[in-house]
């Protein structure tokens, strides 16, 4: 029997597995969809695919700096318990090595990469079947630069900093600052015009409401805008390890400059599903009956 697009679509809908996995399963069974499902269930693919639909907003951030390149990976799971699991962390570190060795910046490319003689996606499916939770590599990045630093806080926040000049220790300190202070931009002059204009409108309205004369209000707004662009930018912020100096001063004192930074935080932007305890228990009991 010919393996049609409609057949692949039906198998995807029934198992939740990826298109290529579904096509492969159908080719192996000569288009017999029921046998394909049976084989996928035996191999754990269908089970893993069903779990892939569940929200994975916990996890870990991992980093590596070596040979002029810094790599950072976010690997998600469903619970903080699994985020500390030895097998989960081992898989994460293996993915980090694969991403670094192959300069991978795309999750699809990472899933298709080879790990221990299999595709990363296949190793992931096996781990999902073993652990019983959705596990998902979410994002990965490789950057190159003159001086690179990486810092991970509690496994949940990771930062790569890219400097010119200075050394790795300085770059790590800058990365630590970014993890703690979460600046939105690198330098005050990097703050987009639309962001500046929006804040300026707010500050003008505040000044007008305060009843200040126009010339005083204008000076107030100018001062507040300078403070605002400093607060939201890395170099304008007080250095977390020594608030008596700014990050800009720290860099200048070490004959260095910051080019950019990348900050990952576990689960940011993922809408978490909330359930009350009774509903969660009821759902688990219902699942146990199946």
Curated annotation (Swiss-Prot):
Which one Pfam family would you cite for this protein? Answer: EF_TS
Q: Where is the signal peptide?
A: none
Q: Which family does it belong to?
A: Belongs to the EF-Ts family.
Q: Which GO terms describe its cellular component?
A: cytoplasm
Instruction: Output the InterPro entries linked to this UniProt entry.
Output: EF-Ts_dimer_sf, Transl_elong_EFTs/EF1B, Transl_elong_EFTs/EF1B_dimer, Transl_elong_Ts_CS, UBA-like_sf
Family matches, as Gene3D superfamilies: 1.10.286.20, DNA helicase RuvA subunit, C-terminal domain, Elongation factor Ts, dimerisation domain
- The name under which this protein is listed is Elongation factor Ts
Q: Which stretches does the entry tag as region Involved in Mg(2+) ion dislocation from EF-Tu?
A: 79-82
The answer to whether UniProt assigns keyword Protein biosynthesis to this entry is yes
Could you name the domain of life of the organism this protein comes from? Bacteria
Task: Reply yes or no: does the keyword Cytoplasm apply.
Answer: yes
Keywords assigned: Cytoplasm, Elongation factor, Protein biosynthesis
Its main subcellular localisation, reduced to a broad class, is cytoplasm
Molecular function (GO) terms for this protein are: translation elongation factor activity
Provide the function of this protein. Answer: Associates with the EF-Tu.GDP complex and induces the exchange of GDP to GTP. It remains bound to the aminoacyl-tRNA.EF-Tu.GTP complex up to the GTP hydrolysis stage on the ribosome.
Give the location in the cell: Cytoplasm
